[in-house]
Amino acid sequence: MTQSTTEDTLLRLAAVIDSRKGGDPEQSYVSRLFHKGDDAILKKIGEEATEVVLAAKDVRQGGAPSALVGEVADLWFHCLVALSHFDLSPADVIAELERREGMSGIEEKALRKRREREENGG
């Protein structure tokens, strides 16, 4: 799968998720999540993140890698719901990843801390 195809897939899925805002919670799982509010969405992300960890541990012990892929897909999906809820999109995340590209994690973390200090007047 190419990068543009991956980005296109995320943007298409995000558009479908956005279209569920204000929808009938009896007809759509995503509409139901939006209707319940951000606490329900965030709780679901926490649950899915835990399932990713457990699936990864299973793979480490010889479990099916496809289970891990499925759990990561669930996590990404619910993260897309959260982004939509807060009027953000995958493009915002992609832009941030592109900004970090080529920068070591240590360097990126130091830069982030420096920015936080500057923003807080320190």
UniProtKB/Swiss-Prot annotation:
Recorded GO MF terms: ATP binding; phosphoribosyl-ATP diphosphatase activity
GO biological process: L-histidine biosynthetic process
Keyword Amino-acid biosynthesis among record annotations: yes
Gene Ontology CC: cytoplasm
Main location class: cytoplasm
Keyword Transmembrane helix: no
The protein's Enzyme Commission number: 3.6.1.31
Key words, A-Z: Amino-acid biosynthesis, ATP-binding, Cytoplasm, Histidine biosynthesis, Hydrolase, Nucleotide-binding
Subcellular location: Cytoplasm
Chemical reaction(s) catalysed: 1-(5-phospho-beta-D-ribosyl)-ATP + H2O = 1-(5-phospho-beta-D-ribosyl)-5'-AMP + diphosphate + H(+)
Family to which the UniProt record says this protein belongs: Belongs to the PRA-PH family.
Database matches in SUPFAM superfamilies: all-alpha NTP pyrophosphatases
Protein name (Swiss-Prot/TrEMBL): Phosphoribosyl-ATP pyrophosphatase
Pathway: Amino-acid biosynthesis; L-histidine biosynthesis; L-histidine from 5-phospho-alpha-D-ribose 1-diphosphate: step 2/9
InterPro entries in alphabetical order: HisE, PRib-ATP_PPHydrolase-like
HAMAP family recorded: HisE (MF_01020)
